[in-house]
């Protein structure tokens, strides 16, 4: 796969030079518990200037080979010193030597105790350039004839050359296992990264793998996570990753998540990750206009686990109404927002062929200030691994008042064969790194059995309805039309102090004849106009589906909830009249 060399114009070489000059940081870092990427060691270039090879690359392009090298120089003195005016050359394994061109943005001097990165590049028409073996600094005196060349120092590079995104990292010290912390000393000696979750999901753009790292500042001053890329690698090719967060600042001791989304292809299995850092080279055009060429260099490889990293066996068994434990680093649900699952039921749908699971979550603000109502996403996974995404109830509420709770429903369309016995519930953040979902909580659960010690006590969470008595009678009219009148005596109580939407739960009443046909129906809310109340009330059924009198009748009481796919009904009680 040919590499992509991005080109962009800048206003001045000075601005590019500022970008290329990093803040002071040692290349070698000793971090207990973290696998630190080794560097080539430091070399004495002059009595005051020491050198390191930061990166070397040799990448095939469409018309040849592009060789890049970046060296890092340190001023060990107490005064500003000039960058030695040496040529940088590269030698192949066949003994062919090339002189690299210096970037127009390379620094001319080094502040005391500071460092600078010098970039070099050369494009060859020769496609089959052999492996690079050595970098060397050469002092050239062009003011004598013949010109005088004095070798200063040579550094072996045969083990660190990057050959492009599809190449493999074979250095044992640069291959890390999943979950093993690592650092990138070429960027920072204080920031540590630990891969923690890997999730495969489908997106409108195609299959994607979402990687989550914990970035931790081990140092003593605030740092910004530098730019680096993570690519996914299969057996045949690599897939570029994109970081979701633009600017991540870490105070000393602080931890934050950073995420990468890697778009792949159908049936592709990633087996490793390549961690790459950016390099730049600036060249001047005919009119002294600077052009920046950006490229990346592989630093280390992370071996991927064979499947998603969420271990179902480690997730707790959930008890309804308990507070759900969220990832403490999540950005969607704060510590003062309490979320609990209060009901999980299986419902029949209007259309044949599938059922609907309804999950009711109570979201409570335990703090003293209004907070946003968190719009988390949910997903159910059954024992066979089939995943069902939840559809959130539409609500106009955006803020939670202090000490108040709000009820939010989620619906899941499932096959009619689904029993709902062994389910995994995942709560996800689908906003922080949209369009990807990242898990922020998870637990094992099951659909609640529709059983009650009292057959006349019906649950329409957040309401309990005690059916004291009921009766159905014929209702005639002067025009000869008839209907049915139902008398209901109810005792309605609220289970929790929670604000419920008008569509959170309704009572649906069906009148069914001896043949099992529904001849009349009515849905009555618990909120708003014509709501159900405690005490005696009468309901009229006039829009009948039969033109003749039917008797006896069967009365069926359902909990009815509107979902985007239609009405979902849960049968609560059947009564013969």
Task: Walk through the language-model features, giving the residues of each.
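Accessory, solvent-exposed terminal regions and/or long lumenal/extracellular loops of proteins
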Residues: 430-433, 437-445, 450-472, 483-501, ...
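Sec-dependent N-terminal signal peptides of Gram-positive bacterial secreted proteins and lipoproteins
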Residues: 1-30
């Amino acid at each position: 796969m040919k590499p992509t060399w991005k080109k962009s114009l800048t206003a001045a070489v000075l601005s590019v030079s500022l970008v290329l000059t990093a803040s002071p940081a040692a290349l070698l870092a000793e971090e207990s518990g973290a696998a630190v990427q080794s560097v080539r060691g430091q070399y004495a270039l002059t009595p005051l200037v020491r050198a390191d090879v930061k990166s070397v690359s040799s990448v095939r392009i469409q018309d040849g080979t592009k060789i890049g090298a970046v060296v890092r120089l340190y001023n060990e003195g107490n005064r500003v010193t000039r960058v030695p005016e040496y040529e940088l050359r590269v030698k192949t394994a066949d003994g062919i030597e090339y002189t690299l061109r210096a970037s127009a943005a390379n620094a001319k001097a080094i502040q005391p105790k500071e460092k600078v990165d010098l970039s070099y590049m050369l494009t060859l028409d020769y496609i089959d350039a052999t492996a690079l073996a050595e970098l060397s600094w050469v002092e050239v005196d062009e003011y004598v004839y013949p010109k005088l060349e004095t070798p200063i120092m040579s550094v072996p590079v045969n083990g660190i050359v990057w050959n492009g995104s599809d190449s493999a990292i074979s250095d044992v010290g640069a291959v890390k296992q999943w979950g093993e912390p690592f650092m990138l000393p070429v960027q920072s000696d204080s920031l540590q990264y630990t891969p923690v979750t890997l999730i495969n999901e489908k997106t409108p753009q195609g299959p994607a793998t979402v990687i989550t790292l914990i970035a931790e500042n081990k140092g003593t001053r605030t740092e910004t996570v530098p730019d680096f890329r993570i690519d996914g690698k299969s057996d045949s090719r690599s897939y570029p990753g994109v970081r979701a967060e633009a600017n991540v600042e870490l105070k000393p001791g602080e931890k934050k998540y950073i995420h990468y989304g890697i778009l792949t292809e159908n049936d592709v299995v990633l087996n490793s990750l390549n961690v790459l850092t950016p390099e730049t080279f600036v060249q001047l055009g005919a009119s002294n206009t600077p052009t920046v060429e950006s490229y990346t260099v592989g630093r280390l490889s992370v071996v991927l686990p064979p499947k998603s990293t969420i271990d179902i066996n480690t997730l707790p068994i959930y008890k309804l109404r308990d507070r759900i434990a969220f990832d403490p680093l999540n950005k969607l649900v704060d510590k003062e927002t309490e979320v609990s699952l209060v009901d999980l039921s299986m419902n029949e749908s209007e259309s044949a062929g599938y059922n609907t699971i309804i999950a009711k979550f109570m979201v409570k603000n335990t703090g003293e200030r209004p907070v946003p109502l968190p719009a988390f996403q949910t997903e159910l996974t059954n024992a066979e691994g089939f995943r069902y995404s939840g559809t959130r109830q539409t609500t106009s509420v955006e803020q939670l008042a202090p000490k108040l709770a709000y009820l939010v429903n989620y619906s899941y369309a499932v096959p009619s064969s689904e029993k709902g016995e062994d389910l995994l519930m995942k709560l996800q953040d689908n906003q922080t790194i949209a369009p990807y979902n990242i898990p922020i909580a998870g637990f094992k659960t099951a659909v609640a059995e529709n059983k009650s010690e009292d057959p006349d006590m019906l649950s329409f969470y957040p309401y309990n309805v005690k059916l004291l008595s009921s009766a159905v009678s014929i209702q005639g009219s002067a025009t000869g039309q008839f209907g049915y009148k139902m008398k209901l005596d109810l005792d309605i109580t609220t289970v929790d102090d929670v604000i419920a939407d008008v569509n959170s739960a309704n009572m649906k009443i069906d009148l069914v004849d001896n043949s099992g046909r529904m001849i009349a129906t009515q849905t009555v809310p618990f909120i708003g106009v014509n709501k159900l109340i405690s005490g005696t009330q009468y309901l009229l059924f006039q829009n009948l589906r039969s033109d003749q009198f039917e008797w006896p009748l069967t009365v069926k009481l359902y909990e009815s909830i509107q979902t985007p796919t239609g009405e979902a009904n849960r049968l609560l009680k059947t009564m013969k009249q």
